[in-house]
């Protein structure tokens, strides 16, 4: 997964730079989300990866999916990906693109994993603390993961803050076995 993100990052940066320059970040965002969903569909992906399909035929398939929403720039981008056998990276490119878009809008997307559901008050306290820490607006999504036993794991981009009981037990286990 990390390797795919590494490969996808330059494509996402180039797409975002172009879209920003053209004032079309939302249009590109929509197109990349649709294309990402298409590539993740097993039947479509199997058809797309048939050896007899040329890169231009692959791009034509995407043109049919996007319909009138496909600009010439998106078509050129897809051609570049198809020519380099990188269409499989579309989900990662879309993810990286959205990350760049959030950074540009000074918004940090945060995923909070908690052993138990958080109350609205707890969510608000965490949101306020994270906005202060990152000095920007924060959007929070909460996932309940009972395996954590207690505590939370906070993920913001590449940063992870793990204050879960599971993590603390693992650290104790490592120390005892060392």
Curated annotation (Swiss-Prot):
One of its GO terms (molecular function) is proton-transporting ATP synthase activity, rotational mechanism. Keywords: ATP synthesis, Cell inner membrane, Cell membrane, CF(1), Hydrogen ion transport, Ion transport, Membrane, Transport. GO terms for cellular component: plasma membrane; proton-transporting ATP synthase complex. It comes from the Bacteria. Pfam families: OSCP. Gene3D superfamilies: N-terminal domain of the delta subunit of the F1F0-ATP synthase. It is a peripheral membrane protein. The keyword Hydrolase does not apply. It is found in: Cell inner membrane. F(1)F(0) ATP synthase produces ATP from ADP in the presence of a proton or sodium gradient. F-type ATPases consist of two structural domains, F(1) containing the extramembraneous catalytic core and F(0) containing the membrane proton channel, linked together by a central stalk and a peripheral stalk. During catalysis, ATP synthesis in the catalytic domain of F(1) is coupled via a rotary mechanism of the central stalk subunits to proton translocation. This protein is part of the stalk that links CF(0) to CF(1). It either transmits conformational changes from CF(0) to CF(1) or is implicated in proton conduction. Belongs to the ATPase delta chain family. F-type ATPases have 2 components, F(1) - the catalytic core - and F(0) - the membrane proton channel. F(1) has five subunits: alpha(3), beta(3), gamma(1), delta(1), epsilon(1). F(0) has three main subunits: a(1), b(2) and c(10-14). The alpha and beta chains form an alternating ring which encloses part of the gamma chain. F(1) is attached to F(0) by a central stalk formed by the gamma and epsilon chains, while a peripheral stalk is formed by the delta and b chains. This is ATP synthase subunit delta. The lineage of its organism: Bacteria, Pseudomonadati, Pseudomonadota, Gammaproteobacteria, Moraxellales.
């Amino acid at each position: 997964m990390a390797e795919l993100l590494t490969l996808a990052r330059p494509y996402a940066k180039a797409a975002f730079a172009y879209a920003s320059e053209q004032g079309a970040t939302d249009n590109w965002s929509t197109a990349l989300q649709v294309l990402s969903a298409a590539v993740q569909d097993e039947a479509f992906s199997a058809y797309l990866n048939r050896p007899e399909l040329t890169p231009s035929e692959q791009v034509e398939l995407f043109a049919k999916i996007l319909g009138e929403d496909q600009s010439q720039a998106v078509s050129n981008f897809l051609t570049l990906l198809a020519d380099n056998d990188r269409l499989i990276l579309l989900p990662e490119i879309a993810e990286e693109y959205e990350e760049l878009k959030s950074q540009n809008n000074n918004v940090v997307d945060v995923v909070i994993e908690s052993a138990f559901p958080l109350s609205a008050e707890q969510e608000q306290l965490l949101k306020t603390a994270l906005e202060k820490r990152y000095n920007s607006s924060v959007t929070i999504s909460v996932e309940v993961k009972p395996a954590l036993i207690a505590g939370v794991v906070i993920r913001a981009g590449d940063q992870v803050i793990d204050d879960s009981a599971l993590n603390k037990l693992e650290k104790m286990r490592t120390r005892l076995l060392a």
